[in-house]
Amino acid sequence: MPGGKRGLVAPQNTFLENIVRRSSESSFLLGNAQIVDWPVVYSNDGFCKLSGYHRADVMQKSSTCSFMYGELTDKKTIEKVRQTFDNYESNCFEVLLYKKNRTPVWFYMQIAPIRNEHEKVVLFLCTFKDITLFKQPIEDDSTKGWTKFARLTRALTNSRSVLQQLTPMNKTETVHKHSRLAEVLQLGSDILPQYKQEAPKTPPHIILHYCAFKTTWDWVILILTFYTAIMVPYNVSFKTKQNNIAWLVLDSVVDVIFLVDIVLNFHTTFVGPGGEVISDPKLIRMNYLKTWFVIDLLSCLPYDIINAFENVDEGISSLFSSLKVVRLLRLGRVARKLDHYLEYGAAVLVLLVCVFGLVAHWLACIWYSIGDYEVIDEVTNTIQIDSWLYQLALSIGTPYRYNTSAGIWEGGPSKDSLYVSSLYFTMTSLTTIGFGNIAPTTDVEKMFSVAMMMVGSLLYATIFGNVTTIFQQMYANTNRYHEMLNNVRDFLKLYQVPKGLSERVMDYIVSTWSMSKGIDTEKVLSICPKDMRADICVHLNRKVFNEHPAFRLASDGCLRALAVEFQTIHCAPGDLIYHAGESVDALCFVVSGSLEVIQDEEVVAILGKGDVFGDIFWKETTLAHACANVRALTYCDLHIIKREALLKVLDFYTAFANSFSRNLTLTCNLRKRIIFRKISDVKKEEEERLRQKNEVTLSIPVDHPVRKLFQKFKQQKELRIQGSAQSDPERSQLQVESRPLQNGASITGTSVVTVSQITPIQTSLAYVKTSESLKQNNRDAMELKPNGGAEPKCLKVNSPIRMKNGNGKGWLRLKNNMGAQEEKKEDWNNVTKAESMGLLSEDPKGSDSENSVTKNPLRKTDSCDSGITKSDLRLDKAGEARSPLEHSPSQADVKHSFYPIPEQALQTTLQEVKHELKEDIQLLSCRMTALEKQVAEILKLLSEKSVPQTSSPKPQIPLQVPPQIPCQDIFSVSRPESPESDKDEINF
C-alpha cells in the first residue's frame, strides 16, 4: 500500500556500506579506475592503522600504493601490479611495502575491479593482509632462534584464519596461483557488490512488510482477530462444547492461519529505530523472538481439540475453556499494525465502531456469567428469584423447572435469547439510555452495572462525542504529515514537475519525516533556555565532538558555543550538497551514510562516516568556489556549521583556534581542484600521436622558391599601397550628356564628348604613356554624322587610371560606356545642334585662373559641325558654360570641354577594343602557362623534400617570368605585374 510504506526504501548506492560490513576486519582501499594512476577515493580505518597514514594523506594517492614503495620492493611485482590495473583484471600479490615510519612490512594484496550497472569498471578494490610473520625481508637478530618461533606461535594462536588463508603459500607456483584465483572468484561473487543506485534488496525467502501480499494478509489477520475476540468470550461464558463439526473445523482453520502468520513473521522485514528497513534474516528472527513470539504462540494453541472429546473431565474442560481467553492476545497484532490501518480515514471510523461493539460484547458475556452464577445456589440447590435470569425467564414464558429425578434445574431461556438480552442490556447501559426492562437486582449485578456505566460513559464520550478531538490530539502529527504530503502532491501536479524529480521530493519528505517524526527541532529549542539549549545541542552533536580529534582540546564553553551553531541536515540519495561553482560557505561533517565527490564527471573521492569536507575558512580570506559536485549516495546525516559562525567562535577562543587549525584535516577540500588525466584522454592522445607520426609532414624551408615568390608578391603589394597613399589621384571622366539650351533648340546629328584628366600618379609602380600614344588616342576621336533622324548619343569615357572596378580597360570599358549611354538616352532627345554649338562658344568666368592651376594637354582636332579644323582651342577652357549638374560631385574644379564625335569613331573604338581583348587573352594564356610551370617545379621540389636526402641537394631552378606582351589602352597607365594586379585587370 503506497501510504503504508514505513522506512527508507528509495534506491540508494549502498556499495560502501556493503564493503565495510562484509570486510569489517580487513584493510582495503578504493581507487578510481577511470583516472590516470588510479587515485585512492576511500580507505577504511583498518588500512590507516596498518599503514600508519591518515585517511587524508592517502586520498588521491595511487591505488598501486606507490607511495609505500621502498628499496626492497620487488620491481617485477610492481610491474605486475600496474599491468593488473591497466588490464582491469583481478589478481593477488605478495609485496613488500613501507609504513609511514618507513618500517618494511609484507602484505598479501588482492586487487578486484568494481563494475557499475553498465558493466564498466569504475573502481578498484584493494585489500591488504599483514604476512610479515611468515616472510621476513630483512634478517636480523630478532628473527633468529626462539624469538622467531615465539612470534610465529603467538601469531598462529591469535589469527588462525590468516593461517588457513596462507596455507598454500609454500606449495608450488601452480598450486599457489590456483588458490589465489579461487580466492578472487570467491571474493568477486560474495563480497564485491556493484557500484550503482539500486532499490533495497531483500534476501531470498524474505517478505517486504509493505508489499501487496503482506498488506492483504494483515487485513485477513485483522478480521480473524476480531472473530477470535468475539467467539472466545462467548464460548467461555456460555460454556459451549464444540459438538458442531463445522464450528470446530472453522476454529481449527483459524488456528492454522495464525500459526502460518507466526512463520511469516520470521521472514518479514521491519523498520529499524533509525528508519531503515531491516532485511537481515538473523536480525528479523531475533527481533520477533524478543517481542511478540511468545504471545502469538500462546494464542495459537488448539484448545478446541481437547474440548471436542466426549469423555473429558468437566474440570479439565473448564480449564482449557478458560485458557481460550489467551487468544485475546491476538489483539496485539492489531495494535502493532494500527499505524498501517490508520492510513485510511474510513478504516479508523470502522475500527472505533468495532471497538465499541467488542467492548459491549465482552461486557454482555460477563453480565451473563454473573447471572448464571447467581441464579442457582449450588449449596442449597435452590433458585434465586431475584436474579435477572429468573426474571427474564418469567417475562418471556420459559421458566426454570426442577427435575426431581436428576436433581437439577432445567428450562429457562435459550442461549441465543440469553446472549441477545445480555448484549441489549450492555448496549443500553454503555449509551446511557437504560430502558429498565432488564435491571440488576443482586449486589454483584449492581456493582457490575456501576462499573459498566462508568466505562460506558467514558467510551461513549470518547468515541462518539469527541472523535474530532481524538484525531486532533492523538494524531496531530499524522494529520500534519498527510497535510504536508497533500500540499506537496498538489504543488507537483500544479507545476507539472517531472516524475523523477517528484519522486525524489516525495522520498525526501518521507525520509525526513521518519527521522524527525514531525518534530520541529528549532521550535523545541526555542522554548528551552539558553543553557539548556546549549546542553541539548552538545548532546545532538556528540558524535562529531567525540570522533574528531580537533575538538578534544576544546573547553566546555567552546563546545557549547560550537554546538549551538551546528545544524543537522538529512540528505536523500541523489541530493547534491554542493554544485560545482557554488560558494563553499559551510564545513560539513559526515555522521552517517556515504557521499561521492564528482569532478569532470569522474569520482575523485567517496566520503563516509567520520569524513569532513568543505574549505579551510580559518586560513583563507575569501570564499571558495566549489570545484566539484558532492552528491549523496545513501541517506546521509550531515552536521554543518556556517563559515561566519565558525570564524566567530575561533576568533573568540584563540587557544582552541590553534588546536583546531592544526588537528582538523579535511578529507576533501572543495577549494583545491584535483589535477588528473583520464585514461581515455591518454589513449586518444596516443592514437593522435601515432596518426601524426604516420602522416607525411609538408614543411617548406625558408629559402624555398615558393616562399620567395610569395614574399615578392607581398613586397609589391606593400609598395603599391604605399604609393597610393602618398599620391592624391583625381578621377577624370569623359561624359556625353544632352543639355537643354535657352532657346529650346536641340542639337541633332552630333555627339558631345566631355574630356578631363587628373594628375598622373608619380610612383615606381606606374608610368605615363608617351606623347605618341596620347596623340594616337586623340586622332581616334573623330566626328561621325548620324544616320537619318538618329538620336544624339553620348559616350562616357572613364579615367585612364585603371581602377579596381574594371572600368578602365578593354571591352569592359566599352560595356560600361554603353550602359551610361542608355541611362542618358532620355535627356539627349532634348539637345539640339545649335545648343551644343552655343555651349562651345561660351567662355566661363574664371577659366584663366583655373587653367593656371590645372593644364590639360588634350586639344580639339576636328569639328565637322562648326567647320573648324585644327583649332587651337583648349578643351579645358570650354566646359564652364554647362549647368552645375553636369560637373562631377566629387571634383568640382575639373574643367570640361565638348566636341562632336562622328559615328565612324565608334566603329574604330570597337575594333580597338576587340584587338585589346585579344591581346589580354594572349597575355593571360602566357601567364597561366608560366604559373603551371612554377607549380610543377614546386610539386617536384616538395616530393624531393619528402624523400630522405642521401646526396647533395639539387640546384634550384630559377623561376622564369613570361615575356610581357605589349598592350595599349586609350586611357590606361601600366604598372608592375603581380597576381593581384592581374586579377584586377582581367576581371570580366
Swiss-Prot record:
This protein's UniProt keywords: Calmodulin-binding, Glycoprotein, Ion channel, Ion transport, Isopeptide bond, Membrane, Phosphoprotein, Potassium, Potassium channel, Potassium transport, Transmembrane, Transmembrane helix, Transport, Ubl conjugation, Voltage-gated channel
Transmembrane segments: 218-238, 244-264, 292-312, 320-340, 347-367, 447-467
Cell location: Membrane
Pfam families, A to Z: cNMP_binding, Ion_trans, PAS_9
Region Calmodulin-binding: start-end pairs: 704-715
UniProt xrefs under InterPro entries: cNMP-bd_dom, cNMP-bd_dom_sf, Ion_trans_dom, K_chnl_volt-dep_EAG, K_chnl_volt-dep_EAG/ELK/ERG, KCNH_animal-type, PAC, PAS
Motif Selectivity filter: where in chain: 432-437
Predominant place of localization: membrane
Residues with the Phosphoserine modification: S883
Residue location of crosslink Glycyl lysine isopeptide (Lys-Gly) (interchain with G-Cter in ubiquitin): K785
GO MF, one example: calmodulin binding
UniProt biased composition (Basic and acidic residues): 871-885
Biased composition (Polar residues): 723-741
Domain PAS residue range list: 14-86
Cellular component GO terms held in the UniProt record: cell surface; voltage-gated potassium channel complex
Extracellular side: 239-243, 313-319, 368-419, 441-446
Record membrane topology: Multi-pass membrane protein
Glycosylation (residues): N403
One BP term from GO: regulation of G2/M transition of mitotic cell cycle
Alphabetized PANTHER family for the sequence: POTASSIUM VOLTAGE-GATED CHANNEL SUBFAMILY H MEMBER 5, VOLTAGE AND LIGAND GATED POTASSIUM CHANNEL
Role of this protein: Pore-forming (alpha) subunit of a voltage-gated delayed rectifier potassium channel that mediates outward-rectifying potassium currents which, on depolarization, reaches a steady-state level and do not inactivate. The kinetic is characterized by a slow activation time course and a small voltage dependence of the activation time constants, therefore, starts to open at more negative voltages. The activation kinetics depend on the prepulse potential and external divalent cation concentration. The time course of activation is biphasic with a fast and a slowly activating current component.
Quaternary state and interactors: Homotetramer. The potassium channel is probably composed of a homo- or heterotetrameric complex of pore-forming alpha subunits that can associate with modulating beta subunits. Heteromultimer with KCNH1/EAG.
Family, per entry: Belongs to the potassium channel family. H (Eag) (TC 1.A.1.20) subfamily. Kv10.2/KCNH5 sub-subfamily.
Name by which UniProt lists this protein: Voltage-gated delayed rectifier potassium channel KCNH5
UniProt source species: Mus musculus (Mouse)
Gene that this polypeptide is encoded by: Kcnh5
